[in-house]
Amino acid sequence: GDQDDTYARYIRPLWPELRQMEMGGMTVGLAYNAQLRASKENQVFYSPEWMQENIRSKGPFGEMYRVWGDGKQMVKGDKFDFFGLSGYTVDELKKQGYVVWTGIQPKGSYLAEGDTYCFLNLIGNGLRGHEDPTYGGWCGGRTVLPDSVKNLPRMEQMKYRAEHYPLPDFTAPVMNGLAARFKWSVTPNYADANHEPVIKGALAMSAKPGEKLKLKYTVTDPDKDALTIKWWQYVSAGTYRGKVTVDDPASANTAFTVPADANPGDTIHLILEATDNGTPQMNRYHRLIITVAE
């Protein structure tokens, strides 16, 4: 929202009542050349084969989706947009007048998303990232650095964030969610498409240090798919920085003991994640916020 001073020079002067939230960190690779930084497991989502099967072949919306070597150019004569061309070397593109500012990828492979990051936390996936910028979600979250770190060089700040505020990798669920929505756009019958699991249960609890809480949740799938359950801690969202686990991370009905060294007022964010075995796989989350009582 702040690219090219859009917020400072346009949005804020005209709509001063709008709330701005700045997110930090990368939880999913959507930028140019994201495939170069992706893990081995996530490489598939950027390949020409995956893009064709899951995006480009899905009706008129899929046909409009930009990929490398698609023969398109957003604005005719744009010397920075050489993405639609294929079969040329960097030197050959430069001779044609293009400014080759990023590496060339195979024809049909993933190109890039734009302002999608700004939208991801608005998707109702159960992470509730839109409720509070510190919660975090598919597009990351806001963290408040200690004063001793704020004045350090940027690289030192990034190192500190990585060590003390680890972020989840949401690449697979985001890309699968994108693929599912493209399929929805060409699937008239609800039963012929895959959908997210449904999770019901408490959103908040409170307990004293050392106290055990019973966690009971209902997890179902509208398509009757088999589900995989996983509990995990969203470390950067809570004020308690220690690592915690539930008794049975693979069960929707389990228990959790508040750490003995937790202080009154500390918060612990636990995420219950359900993943189905449909095609494409879809995820649903449920954020439980535990506040340590006196």
Protein language model features and the residues they cover:
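N-terminal acidic, glycine/proline-rich low-complexity segments
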Residues: 1-214, 226, 230-240
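C-terminal edge beta-strand
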Residues: 280-293
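Residue-level recognition of well-ordered beta-strand positions that form the cores
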Residues: 218, 232, 255-257, 271-273, ...
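Extracellular acidic, Ser/Thr/Pro-rich low-complexity tracts
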Residues: 219-223, 235, 274-276
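Exposed beta-strand face motif in extracellular beta-rich ectodomains
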Residues: 266-270
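Low-complexity "stalk/linker" and mucin-like segments enriched in Ser/Thr/Pro/Ala/Gly
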Residues: 200, 233-263
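Surface-exposed loops/turns
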Residues: 209-211, 248, 260, 264-265, ...
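Extracytoplasmic/periplasmic beta-strand context in beta-sandwich domains
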Residues: 229, 252, 286-288
